[in-house]
Swiss-Prot record:
Protein's cellular compartments: Secreted
Protein name as it appears in the record: Basic phospholipase A2 PA-5
Record note on cofactor: Binds 1 Ca(2+) ion.
Entries under InterPro entries matching the protein: PLipase_A2, PLipase_A2_dom, PLipase_A2_dom_sf, PLipase_A2_His_AS
GO biological process, one term: phospholipid metabolic process
Organism taxonomic ancestry: Eukaryota, Metazoa, Chordata, Craniata, Vertebrata
Species in which this protein is naturally found: Pseudechis australis (Mulga snake)
Reactions catalysed according to its record: a 1,2-diacyl-sn-glycero-3-phosphocholine + H2O = a 1-acyl-sn-glycero-3-phosphocholine + a fatty acid + H(+)
Family: Belongs to the phospholipase A2 family. Group I subfamily. D49 sub-subfamily.
Length: 118
């Protein structure tokens, strides 16, 4: 679920940036998304959105699905239980690792999505 995703982000980035910093970044980080991602971090968010869409096609509710995971050496590790839990956990873990590797550009936070995300 989204709270677990937030915790995974903290695991992967070693607590270096609050999870909320990603909530209004670029064209895809946060609710919804459209247009072309503005940078590598925004691409991570688009991939995560697409992964959640795939989970939805499988009948899963990724924003609400609780799953089991551990933080081992700043790497989120999923403990598979059911298809929906495993799929959702994998979406979140891959996104958290992607966020940790991608540069955060302050100029892409809280952008005007109407003009920049076409």
């Amino acid at each position: 679920n989204l709270i677990q995703f937030s915790n995974m982000i903290q695991c992967a980035n070693k607590g270096s940036r609050p999870s909320l910093d990603y909530a209004d970044y670029g064209c895809y980080c946060g609710w919804g998304g459209s247009g072309t991602p503005v940078d590598e971090l925004d691409r991570c968010c688009k991939v995560h959105d697409d992964c959640y869409a795939e989970a939805g096609k499988k009948g899963c509710y990724p924003k609400l699905t609780l799953y089991s995971w551990d933080c081992t050496g700043n790497v989120p590790i999923c403990n598979p239980k059911t298809e929906c839990k495993d799929f959702t956990c994998a979406c979140d873990a891959e996104a958290a690792k992607c966020f940790a590797k991608a540069p955060y550009k302050k100029e892409n936070w809280n952008i005007d999505t109407k003009t920049r995300c076409k």
